[in-house]
Each structure stands twice: as C-alpha cells, then as structure tokens.
Amino acid sequence: ERGHSLPDILLLKELCRILEISADDLLGIENRKITENGNDLAQEEIWHKLQNCLEPLECIFGKDLVPVFLDGTYQEKIVEARKKLAGEGILMPLVRIRDDEGLASREFAILSYRQTLRKESVETEIEDASYIVECLEKTVRENYAHILNRDLVKDMVENLQKKYPALIRGVVPERISYGYLTDVFKQLLKRGLAPWYFSRIIEIMDSECRRNPTITEEELVCTIGKKLQEK
C-alpha cells in the first residue's frame, strides 16, 4: 500500500493481467465482506470506488462543463471519434465521465487507471464538446499502449474472428493467451508500430511460437517488428 490506506492500483492492474482474471475475481467482490459491521451499502460503495480506479479511460471536469456532457453534441462527437480511431486500428474504450470539485470550473482532465494523461482549461464556450472530444481522441491515439487492456484485446479478437475465422480459431486463446497477446501488442505499440497491424501480429506470433516454443517475449517482439518492417 506504499504507506497509504489505498491499494496500489498499478500493482492490482498488473496482477489482473498476469493472472488473466478480472479485478472482481481478484478482489473477491462477490463473496468477501470488507466492512466490520456487514453494512451492504457501505461495502458496495467501497467496491465501487475501487473499481473506479481501474477505468482505462475517464474524463473528469469542473462544474461549468457539466452541460457539455449532457448535450447530445458530445454523444455525436464521441461516436465520430470512435469511428475515426477504429479506422486506424484503435478500439477506444468507453469513457467514464464525472464532475470533480477538485478542478477549476472550466477545467477538465483525461485519466487512465487514475493516471492523468492530459489536463487543461477550456477558455471559451464555443465548441466545448468538439474540443474536449478532440482532446480525448488525440490522447487515446498517443497513449494507446497505456490504455490498452486484455478486455479490449479480447473484443478486437472476437471481432476479427467474424471476418477471418481461420486466423483466430484454435490460435487465440488456445495457443496464444489474451494476456500474452496484450503484452506483445503493447510492446510493439510502444516501439511505434501502427495498431492496424493487429491481425498480422497474431499471424506472426502463431507462426513464430510454433516454430520456436521457447521464444521469449522480447525475441518475439523484435521478430514481429522486423517482419512487419519488411512489408
């Protein structure tokens, strides 16, 4: 806990990734009592606050920006941003939005797993929704390796299987676990690889892992990077 009463969120996130289980399963949310008096409402609030710390994408804002997120314009703009990012091979997670009294009235921040990725103030009310969504889109694009998690990868794999069943069937998660695929994909993204290579990454991973079952993650990342650069 690093000397605090709060859990180490980064450690919790990493344990979920390694064990390939959800935070609910790891924390035993369904069957553990964590209040001294057995107060169900208090227990629910505690788990809710803890789960909030595991949000891959969150936008918090000051009181004067609340109307922006109640307006239909925000919903329309965020859908457009999702479509644009999808065309680049990026699956944008759902954005949790909430007001925060700790921010200035026209200030907003974009967080991932409680880490602040961007924070600034909106100086004018003109096109507030457009500007904030533009910032969200840019932040996701620039920080996708940090935002990406096993659930997003699983959704991408399942969608890919609909169009290319032979590529996925018997491969993911049978030979390549979602956790391992996520780790390799994140490392390649950090090296500047474009996300739209996702299907080729799976194809090369499967080939290399069958050819050399003892290949390390670092060797695999290097091999995939080289093969994709040859194209």
Give the residues covered by each predicted segment.
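Generic detector of low-complexity/intrinsically disordered segments
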Residues: K13-E14, I21, K119
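Hydrophobic micro-packing sites on short alpha-helices
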Residues: P7, L11-C16, L26
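Membrane-embedded alpha-helical signal segments
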Residues: G38-K231
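Short C-terminal boundary/hinge segments that cap the last helix of small helical domains
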Residues: E20-T35
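Recognition helix of helix-turn-helix/homeodomain-like DNA-binding domains
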Residues: E1-L6, I29-N31
